[in-house]
């Protein structure tokens, strides 16, 4: 089992310069290999095998950076090709842009070249770097590699990859369960009738973003003022992303602590985000990220996440009598049934999702536990 820990690092001036060179060299090698592979395939119909070592003689400055970072660029390109041939919808490998505000490189731990001790991190070529280690790491874990990244706000982070023995999770009996229905206006509505008071981080910052975008439009493209303003906008987006991620981590932890079984719908978030009616809401809510957090947190706790088929008519089934309502428009926010049941559409769907999840597992519950 692999576990990743992400920490903030504080490189000095020379280390920042080294990171900048490494980011550039990794991008150069990746793009060079991709270009040669494409050209060779178009001419011969065969796949070209190429390694970063080929370029070091022609471009001696590649020797100034961590060689393992260049090797990982090759591996990342191979992965991109494999992903494309496995599922063409992911798209053909693309060239890496110099203008991307987020930059990174990956290196491997070989013969102790990466070390973490006394609030400092040792990296190949860079030496010792100050690190903000906000959580402890089990001594039994084995350090395998590190990914150094520079975010849009110019802050540096390191993601440390550790190998750990797969723990024997004690599978807990299902005593408490909950169903979650994705909501456009909120993050979700649960089967207990609770609505999340979701802080729409992106929408709250839209006015400020629009103001900064207008200022950018008045700058001459490519000028120092233009680049400075562009970086300011990127920093604002990075801040919004961190706010959203922090909230989703806390919300998924709360649910994991209270419930043994969580039932959700399998939604195609990519398709939903492309819909002009609610694309912004899908991106702002971060439902896909939220379910990913839920999945691994529940698994580590020995609990279960059940995904209901996206074609299951959770919104159209009456949670009281079980009757299927054939006509239900998206704008109908209240569910009304001939049996007399009248309730919020999303609450009704969440109850049905929970029941369907219990049915799939073959579990019956006497009572449900609410989040306090």
What positions do the PLM features span?
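Nucleic-acid substrate recognition interfaces
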Residues: 1-372
């Amino acid at each position: 089992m692999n576990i990743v820990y992400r920490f903030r690092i504080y490189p000095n001036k020379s280390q920042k310069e080294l990171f900048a060179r490494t980011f550039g060299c990794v991008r150069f090698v990746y793009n060079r290999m991709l270009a040669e592979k494409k050209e060779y395939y178009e001419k011969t119909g065969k796949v070209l095998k190429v390694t970063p070592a080929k370029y070091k003689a022609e471009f001696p400055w590649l020797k100034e950076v961590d060689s393992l970072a260049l090797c990982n660029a090759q591996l990342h390109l191979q992965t991109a090709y494999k992903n494309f041939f496995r599922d063409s919808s992911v798209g053909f490998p693309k060239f890496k842009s110099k203008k991307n505000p987020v930059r990174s490189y990956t290196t491997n731990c070989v013969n102790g070249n990466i070390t973490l001790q006394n609030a400092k991190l040792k990296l190949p070529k860079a030496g010792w770097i100050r690190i903000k280690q906000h959580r402890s790491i089990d001594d039994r874990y084995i350090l395998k590699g590190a990914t150094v990244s520079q975010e849009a706000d110019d802050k540096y982070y390191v993601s440390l990859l550790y190998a750990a023995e797969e723990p024997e999770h004690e599978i807990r009996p299902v005593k408490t369960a909950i169903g979650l229905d994705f909501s456009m206006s909120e993050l979700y509505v649960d089967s207990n009738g609770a609505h999340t008071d979701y802080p729409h981080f992106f929408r709250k910052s839209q006015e400020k973003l629009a103001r900064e975008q207008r200022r950018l439009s008045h700058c001459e493209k490519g000028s120092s003022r233009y680049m400075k303003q562009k970086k300011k906008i990127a920093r604002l987006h990075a801040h919004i992303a961190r706010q959203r991620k922090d909230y989703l981590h806390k919300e998924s932890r709360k649910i994991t602590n209270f419930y043994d079984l969580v039932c959700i719908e399998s939604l195609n978030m990519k398709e939903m985000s492309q819909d002009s009616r609610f694309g912004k809401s899908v991106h702002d809510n971060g439902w896909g990220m939220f379910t990913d957090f839920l999945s691994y947190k529940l698994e580590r706790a020995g609990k279960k996440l059940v995904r209901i088929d996206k074609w299951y008519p959770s919104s159209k089934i009456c949670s009281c009598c079980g009757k299927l309502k054939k006509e239900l428009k998206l704008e109908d926010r209240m569910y009304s049934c001939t049996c007399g049941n009248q309730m919020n559409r999303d609450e009704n769907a969440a109850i049905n999702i929970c029941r369907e999840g219990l049915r799939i597992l073959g579990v019956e519950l006497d009572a449900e536990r609410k989040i306090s």
